[in-house]
């Protein structure tokens, strides 16, 4: 008997329910494990210019990681929503964030930079799969951003957000790497970057 594939909307709803049952402490432990794994990768060690994200309450927490990476001497960039697109803006500390925007997300203030400076992109997701496909929130912000750059990409989620299959569209492009607290999935062609 064949089971019907979930739609993007159904998968988003299922993950939302699971997120609601996941204690905050568990998310922070998983985030710590995820980012410690990334910090051991060659791509992170060699990258000076890293795009991360300032996490929302339902995303893998990044606030401490972003601060720690900045203190370690990395140049950190965060996205800022402008219309239907994301601008990339340098992060200079919590004082440079503004949450007075449409989504009430901590976004960096200042001038945007070109994506060509980025050497690594950390990507949030609602769900990821073993083929490194990503399900976002449905607005296409990261789809558009990632289509404009060839920088290495790492998708990060809690373990329960790694699913059997993410529904994809013809324009969707898989990420280079997926990291959860106990799983690393890498594009074989780019494997050397993520060791």
Describe the predicted segments one by one.
Residues 84-195:
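Conserved phosphate- and dinucleotide-binding cores of soluble alpha/beta proteins
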């Amino acid at each position: 008997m064949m089971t019907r594939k979930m739609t993007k909307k159904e998968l988003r709803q299922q993950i939302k329910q699971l997120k609601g049952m996941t204690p905050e402490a568990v998310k922070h432990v998983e985030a710590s494990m995820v980012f410690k794994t990334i910090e051991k990768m060659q791509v992170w060690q060699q990258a000076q210019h890293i795009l991360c994200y300032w996490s929302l309450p339902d995303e893998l927490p990044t606030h401490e990681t972003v601060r720690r990476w900045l203190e370690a001497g990395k140049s950190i960039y965060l996205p800022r929503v402008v219309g239907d697109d994301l601008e990339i803006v340098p992060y200079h500390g919590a004082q440079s964030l503004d949450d007075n925007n449409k989504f009430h997300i901590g976004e960096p203030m200042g001038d945007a930079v070109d994506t060509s400076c980025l050497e690594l992109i950390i990507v949030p997701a609602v769900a990821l799969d073993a083929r490194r496909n990503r399900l976002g929130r449905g607005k296409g912000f990261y789809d558009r951003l990632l289509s404009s750059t060839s920088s290495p990409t790492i998708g990060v989620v809690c373990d329960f957000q790694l699913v059997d299959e993410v529904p994809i569209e013809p324009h969707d492009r898989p990420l280079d790497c997926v990291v959860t607290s106990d799983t690393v999935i890498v594009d074989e062609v780019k494997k050397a970057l993520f060791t």
